[in-house]
C-alpha cells in the first residue's frame, strides 16, 4: 500500500546517515520506539568505553576520570528541556523519577479522607497504583478528569474540579496506548490562574525525545522522563525536571547521601535537583544517556518532531485504507504513537505476524490504563511507533503484513 505522494518529509534530516548511525537497522524493522528505541551507535560505544575503563582501573577511579563529562549530562538534559541543569535529577526510569516526586509530596503533606488527587483518564498504571494505595490505606480520593470532545484531557473540566482539597494533579503528556497529546501547558496555566496549591506532575516519558518540550512553559512541578524510549538512551536510565517551587518546599524521602549530608547537628540537603538522586548509578549508562541527548540536540528537536510526525501521519493514512482496521488515536494534534485494532483479528495475532516478518511493534491491553481502555471500548490494540531512522518503505511493509493477516479474516467476517 503506497504512500500518498502529496505527503512529504520536510525535516531536512539525512535518513541514510541516521540509519548508518543505527546499527540495528541492518537487523530489524524496529517500529517499537515507544517501548525501547534503537540507540545510535555513539550511545553503545560511549557505554562500552566507560565499562572498559572500569575494567582496567576500577569503578571509582573511572568515575573520577570521567567526572567532568558526567557532570555535563544534566546540562545536556537541561538544554533538551529548555531549562537549567540544576533543575535536572538523574534516575533509573521515568517511574523511578515519578515515584521520588510523589513520595516527596506525600512526605510533606497530611493526606486524609478529604484529600483529592486528580488524574488524566489516560494515565499509566504505574502512576495510578500508588494513588490507589493511598486511597485504600488513607482514604485519599482518586478522581479522573474527563476528556473533551477531541479525546484529550478537558482543561475546563479540570478547572471546575479544583478546590483546596486537591493535593496533586497527574497528567501524562503522551500516553503509551494512544497517539493523543494532552495539553500539558494549558493545564499548567489553568492551575496558575486558579492559584491552586496542588502539585503538578507530568509524565513525559513518551513525549521527550519526539516532541519539543519546554519544562518551564509546561508549568509542572515535576516532569518525569525515561531514557530508553524516544530519547534513544540505554535502559535503566531516566531523569526528571524539578521546579523551583519543588526544590524550595520538598525533600526526597528517604534521603540519600548523594543529595544529603549528615552533619553533627542533623543533615543538610543540596539546593539543586540532585537532592532527588541516589548515590549509586551505572555511570556507563549515565554517559550513554548523555550521548543520546547530545545526538538529539545535534539533530534538533524541531527536525526530529517533523520527521516523526510525517512518518506517523503517513502510517495512519495507510492503515485507514485497510478493511476492518480502526485507527484509535485521538486529539487534534497527534504524537508518533500510532494505535489500531481490527474488527475480527486479535491484536496479539497481528503483532505475531509482524514479528514473524521481522517487524517490531507492541500489543496494548487494559491493565496498563484501565480507565482509558474501558471508556473507549478497547480490549486490545497494536501500537506502532516510528522514529527518525525508519523509512516509508518499512511502514508500507508493515501495512502490507497487517493487510495480508487481516484480509482473509475480513472476507469471512
Residue ranges and their predicted role:
Residues 1-413:
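Pyridoxal 5′-phosphate
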Amino acid at each position: 500500500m503506497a504512500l500518498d505522494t502529496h505527503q512529504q518529509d520536510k525535516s531536512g534530516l539525512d535518513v541514510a546517515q541516521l540509519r548508518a548511525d543505527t546499527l540495528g537497522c541492518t537487523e530489524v524493522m524496529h517500529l517499537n520506539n515507544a517501548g525501547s528505541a534503537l540507540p545510535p551507535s555513539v550511545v553503545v560505544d560511549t557505554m562500552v568505553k566507560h565499562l572498559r575503563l572500569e575494567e582496567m582501573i576500577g569503578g571509582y577511579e573511572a568515575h573520577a576520570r570521567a567526572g567532568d563529562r558526567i557532570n555535563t549530562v544534566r546540562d545536556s538534559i537541561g538544554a533538551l528541556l529548555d531549562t537549567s541543569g540544576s533543575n535536572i535529577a538523574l534516575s533509573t526510569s521515568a517511574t523511578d523519577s515519578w515515584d521520588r516526586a510523589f513520595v516527596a509530596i506525600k512526605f510533606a503533606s497530611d493526606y486524609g479522607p478529604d484529600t483529592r488527587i486528580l488524574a488524566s483518564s489516560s494515565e499509566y498504571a504505574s502512576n495510578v497504583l500508588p494513588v490507589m494505595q493511598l486511597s485504600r490505606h488513607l482514604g485519599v480520593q482518586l478522581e479522573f478528569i474527563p476528556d473533551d470532545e477531541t479525546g484529550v484531557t478537558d482543561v475546563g473540566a479540570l478547572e471546575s474540579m479544583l478546590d483546596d482539597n486537591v493535593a496533586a494533579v497527574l497528567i501524562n503528556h503522551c500516553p503509551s496506548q494512544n497517539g493523543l497529546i494532552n495539553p500539558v501547558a494549558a493545564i499548567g496555566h489553568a492551575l496558575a490562574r486558579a492559584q491552586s496549591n496542588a502539585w503538578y506532575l507530568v509524565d513525559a516519558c513518551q513525549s521527550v525525545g519526539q516532541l519539543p518540550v519546554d519544562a518551564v512553559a509546561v508549568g509542572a512541578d515535576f516532569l518525569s522522563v525515561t531514557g530508553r524510549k524516544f530519547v534513544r538512551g540505554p535502559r535503566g536510565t531516566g531523569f526528571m525536571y524539578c521546579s523551583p517551587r519543588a526544590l524550595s518546599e520538598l525533600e526526597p524521602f528517604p534521603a540519600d547521601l548523594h543529595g544529603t549530608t549528615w552533619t553533627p547537628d542533623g543533615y543538610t540537603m543540596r539546593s539543586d535537583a540532585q537532592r532527588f538522586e541516589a548515590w549509586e548509578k551505572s555511570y556507563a549508562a549515565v554517559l550513554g544517556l548523555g550521548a543520546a541527548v547530545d545526538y538529539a540536540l545535534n539533530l534538533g528537536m524541531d527536525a526530529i518532531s517533523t520527521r516523526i510526525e510525517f512518518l506517523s501521519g503517513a502510517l495512519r493514512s495507510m492503515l485507514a485504507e485497510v478493511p476492518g482496521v480502526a485507527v484509535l488515536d485521538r486529539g487534534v494534534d497527534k504524537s508518533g504513537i500510532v494505535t489500531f485494532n481490527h474488527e475480527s483479528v486479535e491484536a496479539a495475532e497481528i503483532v505475531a505476524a509482524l514479528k514473524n516478518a521481522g517487524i517490531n511493534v507492541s500489543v496494548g491491553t487494559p491493565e496498563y490504563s484501565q480507565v482509558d481502555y474501558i471508556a473507549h471500548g478497547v480490549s486490545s490494540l497494536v501500537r506502532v511507533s516510528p522514529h527518525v531512522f525508519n523509512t516509508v518503505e518499512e511502514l508500507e511493509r508493515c501495512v502490507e503484513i497487517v493487510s495480508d493477516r487481516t484480509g482473509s479474516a475480513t472476507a469471512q467476517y
